[in-house]
Design a protein with these regions (language model features):
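A short glycine-rich, Lys/Arg-flanked "PGG" loop and its adjoining helix->strand segment in the class I
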Residues: 96-110
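Short glycine-rich, flexible loops that bind phosphorylated cofactors or substrates
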Residues: 92-94
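Conserved hydrophobic residues forming the short capping helix/wall of the S-adenosyl-L-methionine
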Residues: 58-59, 103, 125, 129
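Active-site capping/gating segments
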Residues: 120-163
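Conserved SAM/SAH cofactor-binding pocket of Class I
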Residues: 4-86, 96
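Conserved beta-strand signature within the Rossmann-like core of class I S-adenosyl-L-methionine
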Residues: 107-120
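Conserved beta-strand segments of alpha/beta enzyme cores
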Residues: 41, 66-68, 112, 133-136
Length: 163
């Protein structure tokens, strides 16, 4: 499951960080990460209540106490976090614009956006105006060929847009 590929890049510390999953849908990548990181708090944010209900039901069924759901649009959300994860919820430029306020005050190492995306991202990254670091998921472990064009896109909290 490529949701867990994010674990290769997120910190492995006993410290309790807060991770916001923007456009969480049914809880991916946050639910698998919440299992792996019980010391972290996960804020699942989505504008569609039905999706949040599914994600919360899954979390409740498997006994996760480090997951909370938030029915809101991310751009008007008043929560704070150390990391943002997303699974192709929106174009990178919009994700950056809509989420930077969530990271205010974070002192976590490599605080920023970690987004799972696929395909050729060169145009999307160029249009976003942010400096993005791409990590090919296929290089992190022995993933099947399906993951050859799957990426983790990292944008640091402090990045300044060029456009």
């Amino acid at each position: 499951m490529h949701s867990l590929a994010l674990a290769w890049l997120l910190p492995h510390e006993p410290t309790s960080y807060t991770i916001a999953d923007v456009g969480c849908g049914g809880g991916f990548p946050s639910i698998p990460l919440a299992i792996l990181y019980p010391q972290y708090q996960f804020l699942l944010i989505d504008s569609i209540a039905k999706k949040l209900h599914v994600a919360q039901s899954i979390a409740d069924e498997i006994g996760l106490t480090n997951v909370s759901t938030h029915h809101t649009r991310v751009e008007s959300c008043d929560l704070r976090c150390d990391y943002i994860v997303s699974r192709a919820a929106m174009p990178l430029g919009r994700l950056y614009d809509y989420t930077q306020h969530l990271l205010q005050g974070s002192r976590a190492p490599r605080s920023g956006i970690y987004c799972l995306k696929g395909g050729d991202l060169s145009e999307e990254i160029a249009q976003s105006g942010v400096t993005a670091q791409l990590t090919a998921i296929s290089t992190l472990a022995n993933y099947p060929d399906y993951y050859q064009d799957k990426w983790i896109v990292y944008v640091a909290k402090q990045d300044k847009r060029t456009n």
